A protein has these predicted regions:
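Bacterial N-terminal signal peptides
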Residues: 1-8
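Sec/Tat signal peptide C-region and signal peptidase I cleavage site
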Residues: 10-14
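Interaction/scaffold regions that mediate signaling and macromolecular assembly across diverse proteins
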Residues: 15-263
Length: 263
């Protein structure tokens, strides 16, 4: 019996954090569009349930570094992605409904992503600290698909999922997010001999060129998703050979709010 309890405790530690509260809020207040290629967020609904959101954020903030370090890698990454997305919603709510873009919440000297308002793993952090420090900068994860998972509250962003990320399902969830984003022709499309893709691929190009599934160039990464991009095998080959150009679309920074119509 004692051994069984130890094994159950160890498994619970490895599984990470209970995301049921965040999952329930997402299911209630995120609206799927175009078969999940995009979503809109009911910020008024989130505002009405802000006490539940704050309770969830408090539970996130209560996690210690020692606890976090005991979790499996996938559970850690799911926790960080969920934290980023939930604290982004909270940031929007600090000004909602008088906010048309997350960029409105910054100043000339400091972007909203550099605001330190997030108590997390023993420090007060910014959204940039989570994404570029804990996720991208830690060296633990080497996962380019996080760029299809973190959501910056904008129409141009990959969709905020209608469910929380979970460590035991993270691989499938990240792949689903990548498939949804890359199959969205408002964000990524072939025009004649030019592949026009989201500016995400410009800003984070290096992340897509680090050898994930053998992709050492942006073209090679995009060719991995040729079906989602609507490319036949020959076109994907020409893309990898540099015979199809890559250009980056303008980013739509308008708030991804319910009724925005294009998100």
């Amino acid at each position: 019996m004692a051994l069984l309890l130890v094994l159950q405790w160890t498994s619970a530690q490895a599984d990470g954090f209970d995301q049921s509260a965040w999952d329930a809020l997402l299911k209630k207040h995120v609206i799927s569009l175009r078969s999940g290629q995009a979503t809109e967020v009911d910020y008024a609904g989130f505002a009405a349930d802000r006490s539940q959101l704050k309770q969830y954020l408090a539970s996130v903030s209560a996690v210690t570094t020692a606890e976090f370090d005991r979790w499996e890698r996938q559970a850690q990454l799911a926790f960080l992605i969920n934290a980023y997305n939930a604290f982004t919603v909270e940031l929007i709510l600090t000004a909602y409904p008088d906010v048309a873009s997350i960029k409105d919440l910054g100043t000339l000297l400091r972007s909203p992503w550099k605001k330190r308002f997030i108590p997390l793993l023993g420090e007060t952090r910014s959204l940039d600290d989570i994404e570029h420090g804990l996720i991208r900068g830690s060296g633990r994860y080497a996962e380019p698909r996080i760029h299809f998972a973190v959501n910056c509250a904008s129409i141009g962003c990959p969709a905020l999922r209608t469910e929380a990320f979970a460590g035991d399902r993270l691989e499938a969830q990240l792949e689903d997010a990548a498939n949804a984003f890359l199959s969205d022709r408002t964000r990524n499309r072939l025009d004649a001999n030019t592949l026009r893709v989201s500016s995400i691929f410009k800003w984070y190009r290096r992340d897509f060129e680090k050898g994930w599934h053998g992709a050492n160039s942006l073209a090679a990464f995009l060719a991995l998703y040729r079906a989602q991009l609507g490319l036949d095998e020959g076109t994907a080959g020409r893309l990898k050979a540099g015979k199809i150009g890559i250009e980056f679309l303008d980013y739509d920074w308008r708030l991804n709010a319910k009724g925005s119509g294009k998100s």
